[in-house]
Amino acid sequence: MENIDVRAVNEACTAPEMRYITRRLGNIRGKRLLDVGCGLGEASVYFALLGADVTSCDLSRGMLDAAGRLAGTNGVKVTTHLAAAEDMRLPPEARFDIIYAGNLLHHVDIDRTLSRIKPHLAPGGVMVTWDPLAYNPVINIYRAIATDVRTPDEHPLGVGDLRLFRKHFATVETRYFWLTTLLIFLIMVLAQRRNPNKERFWKVVVREERKWRRLYQPLEKLDRVLLVIFPPLRLLCWNAVVACSIPLIPDTGASQE
């Protein structure tokens, strides 16, 4: 736990979701941030290092303890809150400028979770999430094989799930990541003969960022071009980042993607 390099994990070229989210949020110093489903706390501590006032929420006391230790190792503090995403149990008056949920929604009831989280977003605030999508055949083969490193409650997001955001938020922006860059995972399996049941590839690719950088970076540029020219390819990406906001005047403004 203490060996986690929080900045490296979140700033790696092979962590495009967090790099985009950090740019999207801008200067977060002094902002109130809720990390829902914080896990070991890598994102919570990173946001705290960037100056945010962080509350880390998880249904596991062990995870919250780990997040607290990681914060201490990095010289920052986070407030911990024990609760499930579908039942936040926060004080009704609790408000946050930023609500972050990383790799969470595909484990929970999305509609219920969004309905519980939304009241705690401050006026002018933003909720940002990222999760896997359901449609890429290569990833679906990986999912069928890597049963030992996945959980039974996982349900990668489909089009219907993405539409749920518009039920709860007036403004929705979506960005997509990992298309041709998925070649890295094929190399891991086919050329390097690595076992997806022994290693969590989504963690390995971040940990081995320097090793994959020369391949990843040009493929990422190719992805950007392809996703602009051929928008339907977006649903074949591995992950989607969704940023949502509630207008100061309810029920105004058009949804956009």
Predicted regions and their residues:
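Class I SAM-dependent methyltransferase SAM/SAH-binding core
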Residues: 34, 40-87
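A short acidic, Gly/Pro-enriched loop at the edge of an enzyme's catalytic core
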Residues: 89-98
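A short SAM/SAH-binding and catalytic strip from SAM-dependent methyltransferases
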Residues: 98-111
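Short alpha-helix
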Residues: 154-175
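Conserved class I S-adenosyl-L-methionine
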Residues: 1-28, 128-150
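A C-terminal cap/extension of S-adenosyl-L-methionine-dependent methyltransferases
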Residues: 181-257
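A short glycine-rich, Lys/Arg-flanked "PGG" loop and its adjoining helix->strand segment in the class I
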Residues: 112-123
